[in-house]
């Protein structure tokens, strides 16, 4: 299976400071038709002694000529549980 190229995203924080993120993975939940993306800050190198902080968002692709993506906060415990399960599966596959 060919590995698809991951995208980079610039996301501002609550103070307006922009941060650059690499896409770790994305997935869509069939039952809700909601899509989620897990991102890692650029420059965060993973090693055996230190865990990398990851960020998860619900996202929607805009139907415009630029195919922009809008990010939304994850709001429910059920969503977080599902994202955590997907992250664990992703981590196991990477080992």
From Swiss-Prot:
PANTHER family: UPF0473 PROTEIN CBO2561/CLC_2432, UPF0473 PROTEIN CBO2561_CLC_2432. Pfam families: DUF1292. This is UPF0473 protein ABC1595. Belongs to the UPF0473 family.
